[in-house]
């Protein structure tokens, strides 16, 4: 005998609606709607930011939208956006842009547990930004054009007339500007102005570091002032290089150490997850992701580069920390004064 369902049709429809709603709430799409997604303003090299975001999402399930731009451009954008900024974390190729944001009170304090794994000299004095990886300023030279023994003892000596047409530099480079600030800190503003004036008079200006390095490699110029990792990046493209690296010693400004840096914004809508991303960047896994992509030094205590770099402990940089470099405005002013900017 067939049993007829005597419930009103409206009850049946209500039950069906509730069931379907329950299934919808259990679906992956419903979960993804509630999932946190971070926005990273990336002033570092594109490949580094992309690989970092991919590894962090694989580790935590948190998606990272990466917006690429120059470090200074992104820092200016954060200032302009204020509390409306969509950025949660900003990652820069150098520290001055973050010093600038910190001075304006736009950065959040970084968790102490994250800062504790990094050397004190490479974090912001207020604990609101951190160095992520390090690189050193070097001279790339072509031994077919000049012997290493004939290179100057100090980077300041490149400003002399004997270097006419023999030294290249990139005045728009953030690291070059940091080097100018280091000279101000070590030797005074007048010495830095003389150095920039001499380079302008006798050196060759290049548009970016890789163009400058390739000029040495191709024998167009004997030496260029660059960061060490550009040479290793070129080595990936061309196994046998014609150029070599020279490291300044005895605390000379030519051996300045600069750092890529990161910070969380006070305006972040996801402060907990932003701190997670910073912690990942300082973790052993995060540091390895970055240094496997770009030949930089890991800053996490106890870690060493596996890219064949000169050991970090053997570098002899000047006693100028990233925090000492401030926002690099002094260098930009000097460059304008001598006609380089």
Regions found by a protein language model. Give the residues of each.
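Bacterial N-terminal signal peptides
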Residues: 15-27
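Early extracytoplasmic/lumenal segment of secretory-pathway proteins
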Residues: 33-99, 341
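Extracytoplasmic ligand-binding site segments that recognize negatively charged/polar headgroups
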Residues: 43-47, 69, 73, 85-221, ...
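Short amphipathic alpha-helical coupling segments at ligand-binding clamshell hinges
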Residues: 52, 62, 191-195, 260, ...
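A ligand-binding cleft/hinge motif common to bilobed small-molecule-binding domains
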Residues: 96-100, 222-243
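A bilobed periplasmic-binding-protein/Venus flytrap-type ligand-binding module shared by bacterial periplasmic
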Residues: 140-145, 184, 257-270, 289
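Periplasmic-binding protein-like
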Residues: 163-171, 280-303
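An extracytoplasmic/periplasmic, membrane-proximal ligand-sensing/linker region
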Residues: 296-341
């Amino acid at each position: 005998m067939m049993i007829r369902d005597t419930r009103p049709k409206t009850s049946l429809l209500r039950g069906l609606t509730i069931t379907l709603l329950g299934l919808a709430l259990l679906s992956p799409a419903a979960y993804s709607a509630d999932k946190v997604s971070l926005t990273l303003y990336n002033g570092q090299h594109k490949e580094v930011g992309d690989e970092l975001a991919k590894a962090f999402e694989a580790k935590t399930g948190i998606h990272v939208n990466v917006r690429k731009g120059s470090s200074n451009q992104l820092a200016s954008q954060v200032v302009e956006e204020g509390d409306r900024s969509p950025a949660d974390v900003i990652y820069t190729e150098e520290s001055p842009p973050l010093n600038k944001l910190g001075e304006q009170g736009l950065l959040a304090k970084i968790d102490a547990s994250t800062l504790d794994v990094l050397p004190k000299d490479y974090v912001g004095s207020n604990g609101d930004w951190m160095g992520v990886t390090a690189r050193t300023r070097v001279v790339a030279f072509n031994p077919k054009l000049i012997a290493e023994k004939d290179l100057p003892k100090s980077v300041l000596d490149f400003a002399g007339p004997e270097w006419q047409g023999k030294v290249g530099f990139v005045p728009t480079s953030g690291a070059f500007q940091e080097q100018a600030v280091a000279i101000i800190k070590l030797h005074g503003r007048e010495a830095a102005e003389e150095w920039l004036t001499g380079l302008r008079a006798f050196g060759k200006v290049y548009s970016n570091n890789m163009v400058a390095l390739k000029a040495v490699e191709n024998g167009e110029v004997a030496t260029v002032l660059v960061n060490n990792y550009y040479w290793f990046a070129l080595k990936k493209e061309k196994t046998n290089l014609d150029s070599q690296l020279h490291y300044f010693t005895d605390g000379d400004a030519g051996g300045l150490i600069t750092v890529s840096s990161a910070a969380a914004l006070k305006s972040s809508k996801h402060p907990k997850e932003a701190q997670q991303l910073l912690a990942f960047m300082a973790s052993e896994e995060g540091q390895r992701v970055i240094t496997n992509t770009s030949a930089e030094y890991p800053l996490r205590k106890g870690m060493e580069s596996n890219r064949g770099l000169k050991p970090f402990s053997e570098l002899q940089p000047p006693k100028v920390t990233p925090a000492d470099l401030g926002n690099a405005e002094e260098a930009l002013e000097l460059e304008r004064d001598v006609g380089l900017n």
